[in-house]
């Protein structure tokens, strides 16, 4: 028995990027189909392993609690923990871009979708 689906867009992978893409397309009233290799209980991919933590710079939560951060400070931390090699130009560019755009592209995007934040400082290094 074969199953047929009709969709405007097929998204392969239900990790963070796939789910964000799906939300954006649903906002535009597209019909979507998401295919993922995992079972439904593991929906979210590697994002689930981050304990829900997201790196963002300059959020109202940080300012309210007196946490001083900047893209420059965060980039120095990122470079130190990532252990980039000499030829890692694109990963460095990505880190710089992300840190300079995390407030608008991540924090405000999530806030517009009524995502609530539990303001706890986490370190990726778990240190």
What are these regions (language model features)?
Residues 7-34:
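N-terminal Rossmann-like FAD-binding beta1-loop-alpha1 element of flavoenzymes
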Residues 37-127:
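Conserved N-terminal/central alpha/beta ligand/cofactor-binding core
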Residues 1-6:
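A short, basic/flexible loop-to-alpha-helix module at the beginning of a structural domain
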């Amino acid at each position: 028995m074969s199953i047929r689906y009709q969709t405007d867009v097929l998204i392969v992978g239900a990790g963070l990027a796939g789910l964000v893409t799906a939300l954006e397309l649903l906002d535009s009233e597209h019909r979507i189909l998401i295919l993922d290799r995992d079972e439904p209980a593991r929906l979210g991919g590697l994002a689930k392993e981050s304990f829900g933590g997201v790196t963002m710079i300059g959020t109202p939560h940080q300012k309210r609690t007196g946490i001083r951060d900047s893209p420059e400070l965060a980039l120095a931390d990122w470079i130190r923990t990532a252990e980039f090699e000499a030829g890692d130009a694109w990963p460095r560019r990505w880190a710089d871009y992300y840190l300079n755009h995390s407030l608008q592209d991540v924090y405000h995007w999530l806030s517009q979708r009524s995502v609530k934040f539990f303001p706890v400082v986490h370190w990726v290094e778990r240190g």
